[in-house]
Amino acid sequence: MEPRKFTVLGTVVGWPNDEEVYAAGAYLLIEGEGEVVPGTFEYGPITNEEFEERFGFQLPDGITAVEFSAYVIPREG
């Protein structure tokens, strides 16, 4: 099967505190979809402007939207 991009969007308090914990949790969610293609896991915060443009509302102060993504080879079944 061909790899496909899988994305998880999280909202976190106090980013980048505990960045590794958030990244590990998102990785596990993505890994649940299939085999993660090595070297494709990426993440980073989304600007408030981009978040509002994409979702139509603003996040409260102190909350950051973070996008986590990787290419995954889906499980057959």
Curated annotation (Swiss-Prot):
| Name the UniProt record assigns to this protein | Gene 43 protein
What's the source species for this entry? Mycobacterium phage L5
